[in-house]
Amino acid sequence: MKRTTMSQPEAATLFIAASEHDSNLYYATRFMAPDPFIYLEIKGERLMVMSDLEMDRARTQASVDRVLSYSEIEQKAKKQGIKDPTAVDIVHVVLKESKIRRLSVPANFPVIHAARLQERGYSLKPKRDPFYEQRVMKTADEVRHIEDAQRATEEAVAAAHALLRRAEIKDEQLWLDGEVVTSERIKKFVNVKLMERDCIAQHTIVAGGEQACDPHNEGSGPLPAHRSIIFDVFPRSATSRYFADMSRTVIRGKVSQE
């Protein structure tokens, strides 16, 4: 006798996050926001719940089916007897009509929201990155965005290397235009070059000598001659939000046989 299996109840996808910091949310909405907002996928429909401040921009820029007003849903929640509605109360009001009680959430979903949803009877299933598996396979446009960021990085690093070539060697240190060449000076140069190409760099590494042997030491102080100088540059495009990554080891002076 063939055994029949019960199908799982339908689940909705839920994010409560800021897309500026959450790549999965930005991927889903193509909307950049510095403050957390609610994003739901309910029975194939993609929804955002936005503050009045962001409503018009979201409706113009976001790649979703509908943008709902947070304040309007908040008023609806108050009429239902909720004195001070939280983000979870807003989610509950939106989900009420769909009768969905199961939620798929990202692994970094805030614990406070998860606890409040569970108190309301929702079942949550966290999903590891990448939340959207299709992110692994890049489209032609995504490849182009990554290439653009990488080219900008290569140009900035090449320009920094040109500075080191111009530097003079005095007392085992590098000098340029009458000043000692420091890690800070070269990092600033690289970061400014990247900004000129609409890329934002953080924690750029230009580390020389013993600092170059210390993983993720960003480097500080004078850069040495005749010793390794590590470059590790990984900016993000301010326009496309895609990253580049480039590492190089250079020496200004004589290379040790060791």
Q: Where in the sequence are the language-model features?
A:
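Active-site neighborhoods and metal-handling regions in enzymes and metal-associated proteins
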Residues: 2-258
